[in-house]
Amino acid sequence: MANPIEQFKIQPLVPLKVGSVDISFTNSSAMMVLSICLITLFLTLSVRSRALVPGRWQSMAEVFYEFIAGMLRDNVGQEGRKYFPFIFSLFMFVLFGNLLGMMPIPVIGFTYTSHVIVTFAMALVVFVGVTVIGFARHGTHYLRMFFPHGAPIATAVILIPIELISYFSRPFSLAVRLFANMTVGHIILKVMGGFVVSLGAFYLIPGAVPFAFLSAITVLEFGIALLQAYVFTILSCIYLHDAIHMH
Protein backbone atom coordinates (compact mmCIF):
# COMPACT_ATOMS: atom_id res chain seq x y z
CA MET A 1 0.00 0.00 0.00
CA ALA A 2 1.42 3.41 -0.97
CA ASN A 3 2.24 5.91 1.74
CA PRO A 4 -0.99 7.89 2.38
CA ILE A 5 1.09 11.02 3.06
CA GLU A 6 2.65 11.08 -0.42
CA GLN A 7 -0.51 12.60 -1.89
CA PHE A 8 0.27 15.84 -0.04
CA LYS A 9 3.73 16.25 -1.54
CA ILE A 10 4.16 19.38 -3.63
CA GLN A 11 5.80 18.55 -6.96
CA PRO A 12 7.46 21.24 -9.12
CA LEU A 13 6.13 21.15 -12.68
CA VAL A 14 8.15 24.10 -13.97
CA PRO A 15 11.27 24.53 -11.78
CA LEU A 16 12.16 28.18 -11.34
CA LYS A 17 14.40 30.00 -8.90
CA VAL A 18 15.19 33.67 -8.39
CA GLY A 19 18.43 33.65 -6.44
CA SER A 20 17.82 31.40 -3.47
CA VAL A 21 14.04 31.79 -3.65
CA ASP A 22 12.12 28.88 -5.16
CA ILE A 23 9.15 30.16 -7.18
CA SER A 24 8.54 26.98 -9.16
CA PHE A 25 5.15 26.37 -10.74
CA THR A 26 3.93 23.34 -8.80
CA ASN A 27 1.03 20.90 -8.87
CA SER A 28 -0.57 23.03 -6.16
CA SER A 29 -0.29 26.12 -8.35
CA ALA A 30 -1.66 24.20 -11.32
CA MET A 31 -4.72 23.06 -9.37
CA MET A 32 -5.40 26.62 -8.23
CA VAL A 33 -5.24 27.83 -11.82
CA LEU A 34 -7.48 24.94 -12.90
CA SER A 35 -9.99 25.82 -10.18
CA ILE A 36 -10.12 29.46 -11.27
CA CYS A 37 -10.54 28.43 -14.91
CA LEU A 38 -13.35 26.00 -14.10
CA ILE A 39 -15.13 28.54 -11.89
CA THR A 40 -14.89 31.11 -14.69
CA LEU A 41 -16.16 28.57 -17.23
CA PHE A 42 -19.02 27.53 -14.97
CA LEU A 43 -20.17 31.11 -14.39
CA THR A 44 -19.74 32.00 -18.07
CA LEU A 45 -21.92 29.08 -19.14
CA SER A 46 -24.51 29.94 -16.51
CA VAL A 47 -25.03 33.55 -17.64
CA ARG A 48 -24.61 33.00 -21.36
CA SER A 49 -28.27 32.43 -22.18
CA ARG A 50 -30.01 34.38 -19.39
CA ALA A 51 -33.20 32.53 -20.22
CA LEU A 52 -36.48 33.25 -18.47
CA VAL A 53 -36.69 29.54 -17.69
CA PRO A 54 -33.19 28.74 -16.44
CA GLY A 55 -31.30 25.75 -17.77
CA ARG A 56 -29.09 23.41 -15.77
CA TRP A 57 -26.03 25.67 -15.62
CA GLN A 58 -28.03 28.78 -14.83
CA SER A 59 -30.02 26.95 -12.15
CA MET A 60 -26.84 25.73 -10.46
CA ALA A 61 -25.32 29.22 -10.54
CA GLU A 62 -28.50 30.72 -9.10
CA VAL A 63 -28.44 28.19 -6.25
CA PHE A 64 -24.90 29.23 -5.33
CA TYR A 65 -25.77 32.91 -5.76
CA GLU A 66 -28.84 32.74 -3.52
CA PHE A 67 -26.98 30.61 -0.99
CA ILE A 68 -24.14 33.12 -0.54
CA ALA A 69 -26.46 36.13 -0.75
CA GLY A 70 -28.63 34.62 1.97
CA MET A 71 -25.59 33.85 4.10
CA LEU A 72 -24.42 37.46 3.88
CA ARG A 73 -27.90 38.82 4.52
CA ASP A 74 -28.44 36.63 7.59
CA ASN A 75 -25.00 37.15 9.15
CA VAL A 76 -23.95 40.64 8.07
CA GLY A 77 -27.16 42.40 7.08
CA GLN A 78 -27.87 44.62 4.10
CA GLU A 79 -24.53 46.36 4.56
CA GLY A 80 -22.81 43.13 3.61
CA ARG A 81 -24.07 43.26 0.01
CA LYS A 82 -21.04 45.25 -1.15
CA TYR A 83 -18.79 42.39 -0.01
CA PHE A 84 -20.70 39.75 -1.97
CA PRO A 85 -18.11 39.41 -4.79
CA PHE A 86 -15.33 38.62 -2.31
CA ILE A 87 -17.38 36.19 -0.19
CA PHE A 88 -18.76 34.44 -3.28
CA SER A 89 -15.27 34.10 -4.81
CA LEU A 90 -13.90 32.79 -1.51
CA PHE A 91 -16.61 30.14 -1.23
CA MET A 92 -16.21 28.96 -4.82
CA PHE A 93 -12.41 28.82 -4.59
CA VAL A 94 -12.50 26.71 -1.43
CA LEU A 95 -15.32 24.50 -2.74
CA PHE A 96 -13.67 23.77 -6.09
CA GLY A 97 -10.34 23.13 -4.36
CA ASN A 98 -12.00 20.61 -2.06
CA LEU A 99 -13.93 18.88 -4.84
CA LEU A 100 -11.13 18.78 -7.41
CA GLY A 101 -8.88 17.21 -4.78
CA MET A 102 -11.24 14.23 -4.84
CA MET A 103 -10.78 13.70 -8.56
CA PRO A 104 -8.08 11.38 -9.96
CA ILE A 105 -6.48 14.07 -12.13
CA PRO A 106 -3.18 12.84 -13.63
CA VAL A 107 0.12 14.70 -13.14
CA ILE A 108 -1.29 17.80 -11.42
CA GLY A 109 -3.84 16.13 -9.12
CA PHE A 110 -3.56 17.80 -5.71
CA THR A 111 -5.77 19.16 -2.92
CA TYR A 112 -4.44 22.64 -2.23
CA THR A 113 -6.81 23.13 0.69
CA SER A 114 -5.01 20.28 2.48
CA HIS A 115 -1.88 22.45 2.89
CA VAL A 116 -1.89 24.77 5.87
CA ILE A 117 0.16 27.43 4.08
CA VAL A 118 -2.62 27.80 1.48
CA THR A 119 -5.46 27.84 4.00
CA PHE A 120 -3.51 30.24 6.22
CA ALA A 121 -2.94 32.60 3.27
CA MET A 122 -6.70 32.67 2.61
CA ALA A 123 -7.46 33.11 6.31
CA LEU A 124 -4.90 35.92 6.54
CA VAL A 125 -6.54 37.75 3.62
CA VAL A 126 -9.88 37.51 5.44
CA PHE A 127 -8.35 38.63 8.75
CA VAL A 128 -6.48 41.62 7.30
CA GLY A 129 -9.45 42.63 5.15
CA VAL A 130 -11.87 42.49 8.08
CA THR A 131 -9.47 44.46 10.29
CA VAL A 132 -9.03 47.16 7.62
CA ILE A 133 -12.81 47.39 7.20
CA GLY A 134 -13.24 47.73 10.96
CA PHE A 135 -10.76 50.58 11.30
CA ALA A 136 -11.99 52.28 8.11
CA ARG A 137 -15.55 52.22 9.40
CA HIS A 138 -15.03 53.01 13.09
CA GLY A 139 -11.56 54.52 13.31
CA THR A 140 -9.88 54.10 16.68
CA HIS A 141 -13.29 53.27 18.19
CA TYR A 142 -12.81 49.83 16.66
CA LEU A 143 -10.45 49.09 19.54
CA ARG A 144 -13.45 49.15 21.86
CA MET A 145 -14.40 45.68 20.69
CA PHE A 146 -11.57 44.34 22.83
CA PHE A 147 -13.36 45.55 25.95
CA PRO A 148 -17.04 44.54 26.07
CA HIS A 149 -19.49 47.39 26.60
CA GLY A 150 -20.79 47.58 30.15
CA ALA A 151 -18.02 45.45 31.65
CA PRO A 152 -16.53 46.77 34.93
CA ILE A 153 -13.33 48.71 34.34
CA ALA A 154 -11.60 46.56 36.95
CA THR A 155 -11.91 43.55 34.64
CA ALA A 156 -10.02 45.26 31.81
CA VAL A 157 -6.72 43.68 32.80
CA ILE A 158 -8.29 40.25 32.26
CA LEU A 159 -10.78 40.83 29.43
CA ILE A 160 -8.56 42.83 27.07
CA PRO A 161 -5.80 40.16 26.84
CA ILE A 162 -8.44 37.45 26.38
CA GLU A 163 -10.18 39.41 23.60
CA LEU A 164 -6.84 40.17 21.91
CA ILE A 165 -5.81 36.51 21.96
CA SER A 166 -9.23 35.49 20.66
CA TYR A 167 -9.06 38.07 17.86
CA PHE A 168 -5.54 37.29 16.67
CA SER A 169 -6.16 33.54 16.81
CA ARG A 170 -8.90 33.84 14.19
CA PRO A 171 -6.72 33.28 11.11
CA PHE A 172 -5.02 30.31 12.76
CA SER A 173 -8.26 28.58 13.75
CA LEU A 174 -9.80 29.34 10.35
CA ALA A 175 -6.78 27.90 8.53
CA VAL A 176 -6.24 24.83 10.70
CA ARG A 177 -9.91 23.82 10.66
CA LEU A 178 -10.02 23.56 6.86
CA PHE A 179 -6.54 22.07 6.50
CA ALA A 180 -7.06 19.42 9.19
CA ASN A 181 -10.44 18.24 7.94
CA MET A 182 -9.32 17.90 4.33
CA THR A 183 -6.05 16.20 5.29
CA VAL A 184 -7.63 13.64 7.60
CA GLY A 185 -10.38 12.83 5.10
CA HIS A 186 -7.91 12.19 2.28
CA ILE A 187 -5.68 10.04 4.48
CA ILE A 188 -8.66 7.85 5.42
CA LEU A 189 -9.62 7.48 1.75
CA LYS A 190 -6.06 6.54 0.82
CA VAL A 191 -5.77 3.96 3.60
CA MET A 192 -9.14 2.38 2.81
CA GLY A 193 -8.30 2.37 -0.89
CA GLY A 194 -5.11 0.47 -0.07
CA PHE A 195 -7.12 -2.10 1.88
CA VAL A 196 -9.48 -2.58 -1.05
CA VAL A 197 -6.60 -3.15 -3.47
CA SER A 198 -4.64 -5.49 -1.19
CA LEU A 199 -7.61 -7.57 -0.01
CA GLY A 200 -9.41 -7.56 -3.34
CA ALA A 201 -6.35 -8.98 -5.06
CA PHE A 202 -6.64 -12.22 -3.06
CA TYR A 203 -10.14 -12.50 -1.64
CA LEU A 204 -13.27 -11.19 -3.31
CA ILE A 205 -15.58 -11.29 -0.29
CA PRO A 206 -13.15 -9.79 2.31
CA GLY A 207 -12.30 -7.06 -0.19
CA ALA A 208 -15.97 -6.16 -0.61
CA VAL A 209 -16.26 -4.98 2.99
CA PRO A 210 -13.61 -2.25 2.83
CA PHE A 211 -14.82 -1.36 -0.69
CA ALA A 212 -18.32 -0.70 0.64
CA PHE A 213 -16.85 1.32 3.50
CA LEU A 214 -14.64 3.23 1.05
CA SER A 215 -17.66 4.08 -1.09
CA ALA A 216 -19.53 5.39 1.94
CA ILE A 217 -16.51 7.41 3.08
CA THR A 218 -16.11 8.87 -0.42
CA VAL A 219 -19.72 10.09 -0.44
CA LEU A 220 -19.20 11.50 3.05
CA GLU A 221 -15.99 13.22 1.96
CA PHE A 222 -17.84 15.01 -0.85
CA GLY A 223 -20.30 16.23 1.77
CA ILE A 224 -17.44 17.35 3.99
CA ALA A 225 -15.89 19.22 1.05
CA LEU A 226 -19.08 21.27 0.73
CA LEU A 227 -19.46 21.63 4.50
CA GLN A 228 -15.91 22.92 4.99
CA ALA A 229 -16.35 25.51 2.24
CA TYR A 230 -19.54 26.60 4.00
CA VAL A 231 -17.87 26.76 7.43
CA PHE A 232 -14.89 28.75 6.11
CA THR A 233 -17.22 31.21 4.40
CA ILE A 234 -19.74 31.65 7.20
CA LEU A 235 -16.98 32.28 9.74
CA SER A 236 -15.62 34.94 7.39
CA CYS A 237 -19.11 36.48 7.33
CA ILE A 238 -19.27 36.43 11.13
CA TYR A 239 -15.90 38.18 11.37
CA LEU A 240 -17.13 40.72 8.83
CA HIS A 241 -20.25 41.28 10.93
CA ASP A 242 -18.10 41.97 13.99
CA ALA A 243 -16.04 44.51 12.04
CA ILE A 244 -19.11 46.35 10.74
CA HIS A 245 -21.33 46.21 13.81
CA MET A 246 -18.67 45.72 16.52
CA HIS A 247 -20.42 42.70 18.07
UniProtKB/Swiss-Prot annotation:
Alphabetical UniProt keywords: ATP synthesis, Cell inner membrane, Cell membrane, CF(0), Hydrogen ion transport, Ion transport, Membrane, Transmembrane, Transmembrane helix, Transport
Report how it sits in the membrane.
Answer: Multi-pass membrane protein
As for subcellular location, the record says: Cell inner membrane
Q: What does this protein do?
A: Key component of the proton channel; it plays a direct role in the translocation of protons across the membrane.
Q: Which PANTHER family match?
A: ATP SYNTHASE SUBUNIT A (PTHR11410:SF0)
Q: How does it assemble?
A: F-type ATPases have 2 components, CF(1) - the catalytic core - and CF(0) - the membrane proton channel. CF(1) has five subunits: alpha(3), beta(3), gamma(1), delta(1), epsilon(1). CF(0) has three main subunits: a(1), b(2) and c(9-12). The alpha and beta chains form an alternating ring which encloses part of the gamma chain. CF(1) is attached to CF(0) by a central stalk formed by the gamma and epsilon chains, while a peripheral stalk is formed by the delta and b chains.
Protein's recorded name: ATP synthase subunit a
